[in-house]
């Protein structure tokens, strides 16, 4: 088999700058003659604010909606719902990890959406990362925060880690 991907998590120092996760990948399986017998794409980006600023959330989601809509207007609602349902701490009374984003997996190329389509889609979503996230960082990076803000950030960051361990 063969796999490639890009994955990142940014855990900021400033309590008012959200954590962000981004992951895009492709997998291939081969038979004994080295022929591709299966291939699929997956990925997504999601935002986990410690303190919610609705304008930042709207901006983040709109940026990914715009990226998705260029390929298929059904992608954003579908992939947003998958993300919303995936990043949940079920052992904590269904606590959400953050405000969601998009997430997709097992997208196999076919006659209408081939390999190049899915590569271009993943690239467009990756390219949306900077315009979706950096404006929020720029707006929030100079905000002063208290020890109480930092304590809350550490609790929420612990829940983020918990999600990945459970």
Residue ranges of predicted features:
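A domain-level signal for the structural core that forms small-molecule/cofactor-binding pockets
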Residues: 1-166
């Amino acid at each position: 088999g063969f796999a490639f991907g890009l994955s990142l998590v940014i855990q900021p120092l400033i309590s008012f700058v959200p954590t962000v996760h981004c992951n895009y990948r492709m997998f291939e399986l081969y038979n004994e003659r080295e022929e591709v017998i299966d291939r699929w794409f997956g990925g997504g980006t999601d935002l986990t604010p410690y303190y919610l600023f609705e304008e930042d959330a709207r901006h983040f989601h709109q940026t990914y909606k715009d990226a998705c809509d260029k390929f298929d207007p059904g992608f954003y609602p579908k992939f947003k719902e998958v993300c919303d349902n995936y990043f949940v701490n079920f052992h904590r009374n269904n606590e959400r990890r953050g405000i969601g984003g998009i997430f997709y997996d097992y997208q196999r190329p076919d006659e209408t959406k081939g390999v190049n389509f899915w590569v271009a889609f993943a690239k467009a979503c990756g390219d949306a990362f900077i315009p979706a996230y950096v404006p929020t960082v720029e707006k929030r990076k100079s905000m002063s925060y208290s020890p109480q803000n930092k304590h809350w950030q550490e609790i929420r960051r612990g829940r983020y880690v918990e999600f990945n361990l459970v």
